[in-house]
């Protein structure tokens, strides 16, 4: 059941405003001239941007924050905020309306002609691509996503048009609250084992979401969607697939996967639309692009506008984001933290290695540096993680990023031991400092380094880039790597 949201002028206060989902909502509200404040113990560039927009931000989550405000606000929390949080406890004591982040997003979805993108993987890329298409098509959409995009310099933009594009998260079950005009489902797998015990529970949440949508855009290449997702008899379903023989409404052929992107011919219900080009690598991103094509066509965009927009789209931050290169050592930052995502990202890395033949080196390698995210996920998918790194020449594994979990069900060393049964080159370096030291002693010209995970591992990239940029190349080349 949704909690009522007051858009009539009562202030909003976000506990944990610096989070990627919370900050996007705050951005949209303040752009609508609504009073917004928030707190976060870890300030970052996103909170700085909100401060520039006029948001009052408290640097700690303290009970006194609410007393310092001129009017008792509606208090917005995410699932990460627990009942023992002092600011939350004060909000309850003062009688402030308490809203879950999803209540606010659901209310915004109701106020627009909305497209909500759901799925275990690919949500951020697909939703940002759809938002970019609408922007290129002159629609001026409002966009709320779980990643940052250079095209609108952040994780949200507030447009003057009637459309909202939102990323719809399933991690805590709140996906069931959303009722958009168009709902996209990219795929369904078991994830978030801290909330779901089995795949059946995940399917049920997605079914509830699908049956709240006026139209569902669904990937027919996902067997769980195709064979197990049940929608209402009168539900409008638009399907997409990478295979013409699937019978999907949108499909492709003549696919060319390359180190700089992907080309394909797009078909719409048996009619050739034309050629599609994307800078994003791999089959998983071609599926994301095809979902964007389907949504664009539903909204009345011509294929020329759609194909031009997809060709120009650069992607979202931390989604195979090339952070820099020094002496032929390239660093890529990717949010992959589920075994399926890791396999897809490593496959894309293999594609990119093909473009690096200028480095004549017998040890040109794909180096995967991975920080597992959450004990529950690592424990549940221990075997799947162990088998996911087959495309990597070297795997460097850190300890597990807890993301607030306290029950240490499994240790990073245990995962490293299991991984070593399937992979010849696995190095366990528990801390970020140990990872940096190891990589400084190991990387060589021609290496493609994929920094993988949803935690803080990507913080190592700037120091490593600086280190290699200052070293003479002959010094790097003297030592033969593992």
Curated annotation (Swiss-Prot):
Annotated positions binding ATP: 119-125
Keyword field contains Ligase: yes
MF-aspect GO terms: ATP binding; UDP-N-acetylmuramate-L-alanine ligase activity
GO cellular component terms, semicolon-separated: cytoplasm
Signal peptide: none
UniProt-listed InterPro entries: Mur-like_cat_sf, Mur_ligase_C, Mur_ligase_C_dom_sf, Mur_ligase_cen, Mur_ligase_N, MurCDEF_pg_biosynth, UDP-N-AcMur_Ala_ligase_MurC
Principal location: cytoplasm
Reactions performed catalytically: UDP-N-acetyl-alpha-D-muramate + L-alanine + ATP = UDP-N-acetyl-alpha-D-muramoyl-L-alanine + ADP + phosphate + H(+)
Pfam families recorded: Mur_ligase, Mur_ligase_C, Mur_ligase_M
Cellular compartments annotated: Cytoplasm
The keyword Transmembrane helix is annotated on this UniProt entry: no
Keyword line: ATP-binding, Cell cycle, Cell division, Cell shape, Cell wall biogenesis/degradation, Cytoplasm, Ligase, Nucleotide-binding, Peptidoglycan synthesis
EC number of this enzyme: 6.3.2.8
Function comment: Cell wall formation.
UniProt-recorded name of the protein: UDP-N-acetylmuramate--L-alanine ligase
Organism: Cyanothece sp. (strain PCC 7425 / ATCC 29141)
Name of the encoding gene: murC
